[in-house]
Regions:
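Conserved GNAT-fold acetyl-CoA-binding loop/helix
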Residues: 1-19
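Short loop/turn motifs at secondary-structure junctions and domain boundaries
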Residues: 21-27
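Conserved acyl-donor/pantetheine-binding loop and adjacent beta-alpha core of acyl/acetyltransferases
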Residues: 28, 38-75, 80-83
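Hydrophobic beta-strand residues of extracellular immunoglobulin-like
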Residues: 30-33
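Conserved catalytic-core motifs of GNAT/GCN5-like acyltransferases
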Residues: 54-60, 108-116, 120, 125-136
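Conserved acetyl-CoA pyrophosphate-binding loop and the N-cap/start of the following alpha-helix
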Residues: 82-94
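Conserved GNAT acetyl-CoA-binding A-motif
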Residues: 92, 99-111
Length: 136
């Protein structure tokens, strides 16, 4: 993700608050946080999952249809001084456990170079996704 121009910061914060105030209560966004056991309330990491409705679609193995929402993993982070201690892995394992319990079969994410090895260890594979950023 690139740098956000200062002029857009307040607009983004307001738009995000508006989105989350609706999406969290209605279940379209679920989040996990990691906090220090010895200092409750001190958040050292987090991960989010946005649920998006999709049409029924063929399963990659081709033998059946997949139904239900697709999960888009967002906002996975660990505070710098707490990295390389398994926090992101623990958050992701819990997030994936939740998706299995809720029957969500299709999960995507956009990996940073630093996060890619973790996601590959968890079973994520690169795809051929492309993007178009049209003119507004």
């Amino acid at each position: 993700m690139g740098e956000l121009p200062a002029a857009l910061y307040d607009t983004l914060v307001q738009a995000a608050r508006s989105y989350f105030s609706a999406a969290i209560p209605d279940g379209r966004y679920v989040a996990w946080v990691a906090e220090l056991h010895e200092r409750p309330g001190e958040i050292v990491g987090g991960a989010g999952l946005q649920l998006r409705d999709l049409l029924p679609r063929p399963h990659p193995a081709g033998q059946r249809l997949m139904r239900g929402p697709q999960g888009l993993i967002l906002n996975v982070f660990t505070e710098r001084r707490w990295r390389r201690q398994g926090i992101a892995a623990g958050l992701m394992e819990e997030l994936l456990r939740w998706t299995r319990a809720h029957g969500i079969e299709s999960i995507v994410l956009h990996a940073s170079g630093e996060g890619r090895p973790l996601y590959e260890r968890l079973g994520f594979a690169p795809t051929n996704e492309m993007r178009y950023h049209g003119k507004a």
